[in-house]
Structures are given as structure tokens and as C-alpha cells.
Curated annotation (Swiss-Prot):
Gene for this chain: rplC
Keyword Ribosomal protein: yes
InterPro entries documented for this protein: Ribosomal_uL3, Ribosomal_uL3_bac/org-type, Ribosomal_uL3_CS, Transl_B-barrel_sf
Complexes and interactors: Part of the 50S ribosomal subunit. Forms a cluster with proteins L14 and L19.
One GO cellular component term noted in the UniProt record for this chain: cytosolic large ribosomal subunit
GO terms for MF: rRNA binding; structural constituent of ribosome
Name listed for the protein in its UniProt record: Large ribosomal subunit protein uL3
Keywords: Methylation, Ribonucleoprotein, Ribosomal protein, RNA-binding, rRNA-binding
Species, as recorded: Stenotrophomonas maltophilia (strain K279a)
Alphabetical list of Gene3D superfamilies matching this protein: 3.30.160.810, Translation factors (2.40.30.10)
HAMAP family in alphabetical order: Ribosomal_uL3_B
PROSITE patterns, alphabetized: RIBOSOMAL_L3
Modified how: Methylated by PrmB.
Length: 216
């Protein structure tokens, strides 16, 4: 089956709130700052081997922009943003975009189902109980050392090693994660806001990518 590509949008998580329906029900929503994305490059099959739209958003001090990036932004005649993001699109869609143009929040509509991708909150080094939902050992009844110990890591001299992927203590969080099939509750282009039903990954102030749902 051929995968269909569609344009997404880069925003910033503002926090959570709630909205009320006409019949008085409360809906929890995440508010996403949706300032216009500036198009920095159009990639085509002829020049790059695939079709894509590259965008930037926000602002970055000139001192923090290296020379290759500065040249890239200057060529597109757009202000340097806080990063570059790329969205694969269908070949037929490229005619709708131009370098230096903008992509706004109105590419989404109320009721649409979307996927939101972000970087989860970092939790630092954590044990197996918090990181992998292991069960604790007994608090008493002869247990004096292994209340939160993970237990056995393997077998004996055969195979004589710990298998890759074994669930152990380690760094938790700060990974890229997607939450799928969230409903768009409100789109406010003038104020630059998108409200989606439910929670999205990451802390307030973190960049998030909103895309049409891949499995809806």
C-alpha cells in the first residue's frame, strides 16, 4: 500500500485548559500556539529525489545562527527561526506552496482528527518500578534488601550475558513521542491557537508537530 503524505504544522505547547459544549459538558484541551510557519525550501523529485516542504517558525538571535543556516534563510528571504522542520507531501501538492510563503493554522478544521508529536518530559535516572511499572517486593516478611530491586537479569553461564532490551534502570523521558487520533476542538487563526482534545507529549513551551492522523 502506498503511503499518503500530507502537510503538517509546527507549534508550541502552551498548556492545558477546558472548553464547555452547548449541553454543559467539560472537554479537556491542550492549547497549541500556532504562529504561521514560514516556508524555507521546496524539495522536488527532480532536485532532491522526493517532494517535501521545509518550514521554520519563531525567531532566533543572529548570533546563534551559523553561516550555512544564515545563507539558507537569506536565500529563501525568510527570518531565521528556532529550527527547521520538513514535511513530505504529494507531488501534486507542491504547486500550492512557494518559498517565502506561510502555512497557517487554517490547514486544520474543527472536528478533524490529528496526531501530535513532541518530546516527553525528562525524568532523569529512574528505577524499574517508575520506568517500567515493575511490582515492588514485600515490605516485610523477611525482605530487608530487595524492596525495589528488579530481580534476576538472566540465566547462568549459558548464555552468560544479559540480553539486549532487558528492562533495567536508566534514563527516563526526553524522547520523541506521538499521541494519535486527537480531535481538533477549535482553530483560532487570528490569535494563533489550536485546541486539541486531550493531552499531548512534553512540557509547556515545547515544540510540537501537528499532522493529519495517519490511522483515522
Amino acid at each position: 500500500m502506498t503511503k499518503k503524505y500530507s502537510l503538517g504544522f509546527v507549534g508550541r505547547k502552551a498548556g492545558m485548559s477546558r472548553v464547555f459544549t452547548e449541553d454543559g459538558r467539560s472537554i479537556p484541551v491542550t492549547l497549541i500556539e500556532a504562529t504561521p510557519n514560514r516556508i524555507a525550501q521546496i524539495k522536488t523529485v527532480e532536485t532532491d529525489g522526493y517532494s517535501a516542504v521545509q518550514v521554520t517558525v519563531g525567531a532566533r538571535r543572529a548570533a546563534l545562527v551559523n553561516k550555512p543556516e544564515a545563507g539558507h534563510f537569506a536565500k529563501a528571504k525568510v527570518e531565521a527561526g528556532r529550527g527547521l522542520w520538513e514535511f513530505r507531501v504529494e507531488d501534486a501538492q507542491l504547486g500550492d506552496f512557494a518559498v517565502g510563503g506561510e502555512v497557517k493554522a487554517d490547514i486544520f478544521e474543527v472536528g478533524q482528527i490529528v496526531d501530535v508529536q513532541g518530546v516527553t518530559k525528562g525524568k532523569g535516572f529512574q528505577g524499574t518500578i517508575k520506568r517500567h511499572n515493575f511490582r515492588m517486593g514485600d515490605a516485610t516478611h523477611g525482605n530487608s534488601l530487595s524492596h525495589r530491586a528488579p530481580g534476576s537479569l538472566g540465566q547462568r553461564q549459558t548464555p552468560g550475558r544479559v540480553f539486549p532490551g532487558k528492562k533495567m534502570s536508566g534514563h527516563m523521558g526526553a524522547v520523541q513521542q506521538s499521541t494519535q487520533n486527537l480531535e481538533v476542538v477549535k482553530v483560532d487563526v487570528e490569535r494563533g491557537l489550536i485546541a486539541v482534545r486531550g493531552a499531548v507529549p512534553g512540557a509547556a513551551g515545547g515544540d510540537v508537530i501537528v499532522r493529519p492522523a495517519s490511522k483515522a
